[in-house]
């Protein structure tokens, strides 16, 4: 009887217990390193010498290409415009029912000349000239990384070089498309062989700030009507 009472009491306490919620921990996919290729060692060809015959030219995403930047550009333009326009008009009525020699002034008819009934003339002249000359020269060497390989095999490259001298940053940014056959055996390519090339050369620092007008001058130039 005593055992039965203890069993009933335990069941009652178990029914009043709060069920503990199961805590689920997020599962993460384990990232395993890519397996390295294995080479079978032979009597002549050893696994350690497998890189001797390998082509070291950049051809995969992430490979690095050395770009030799040589950009020379010059342009000049001159324009001269001269225009001259003249126009004249005149009209007369030699005969008008005999009234060509009469004119009504203050109730009296006097002689009238209809030979110069209407006359007008205009003269417009315009002259303008302009000339512009621009020269650019950029020589540099930098490395760029293959960021993508297109379906036709061409490389999309992108590179950035930052040189800081006396708190002045000189920044070169390069983007473009390169054909694999244009990459030389020493893994270099000339900038003239890069399609859709975007080469930006800029600076940040005290000297660059002094080469630009202040914000107030820019504002006055914007609102000044003359």
UniProtKB/Swiss-Prot annotation:
One GO CC term on file: cell outer membrane
Cleaved signal peptide residues: 1-15
Subcellular location: Cell outer membrane; Bacterial flagellum basal body
Domain of life: Bacteria
Gene Ontology biological process terms from the UniProt entry: bacterial-type flagellum-dependent cell motility
Lipid moiety-binding residues (S-diacylglycerol cysteine): 16
Record key words, sorted: Bacterial flagellum, Cell outer membrane, Lipoprotein, Membrane, Palmitate, Signal
Lipidated sites in chain (N-palmitoyl cysteine): 16
Described function: Assembles around the rod to form the L-ring and probably protects the motor/basal body from shearing forces during rotation.
Family membership noted in the UniProt record: Belongs to the FlgH family.
Protein name: Flagellar L-ring protein
Biological source species: Geobacter metallireducens (strain ATCC 53774 / DSM 7210 / GS-15)
Gene expressing this chain: flgH
């Amino acid at each position: 009887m005593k055992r039965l009472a203890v069993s009933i009491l335990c069941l009652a306490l178990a029914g009043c217990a709060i069920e503990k919620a199961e805590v689920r921990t997020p599962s993460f996919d384990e990232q395993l390193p890519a397996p390295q290729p294995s080479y079978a060692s032979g009597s002549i060809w050893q696994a350690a010498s497998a890189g001797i015959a390998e082509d070291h030219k950049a051809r995969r995403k992430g490979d690095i290409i050395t770009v030799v930047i040589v950009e020379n550009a010059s342009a000049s333009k001159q324009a001269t415009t001269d225009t001259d326009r003249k126009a004249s008009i005149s009209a007369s009525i030699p005969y008008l029912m005999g009234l060509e020699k009469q004119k009504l002034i203050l109730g009296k008819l006097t002689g009238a000349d209809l030979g110069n009934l209407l006359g007008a003339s205009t003269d417009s002249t315009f002259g303008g000239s302009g000339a512009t000359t621009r020269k650019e020269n950029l020589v540099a060497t930098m490395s760029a990384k293959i960021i993508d390989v297109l379906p036709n095999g061409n490389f999309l490259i992108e590179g950035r070089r930052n040189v800081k001298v006396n708190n002045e940053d000189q920044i070169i940014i390069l983007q473009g498309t390169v054909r694999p056959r244009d990459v030389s055996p020493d893994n270099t390519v000339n900038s003239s062989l890069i399609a859709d090339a975007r080469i930006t050369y800029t600076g940040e620092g005290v000297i660059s700030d002094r080469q630009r007008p202040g914000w107030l001058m820019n504002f006055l130039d914007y609102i000044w009507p003359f």
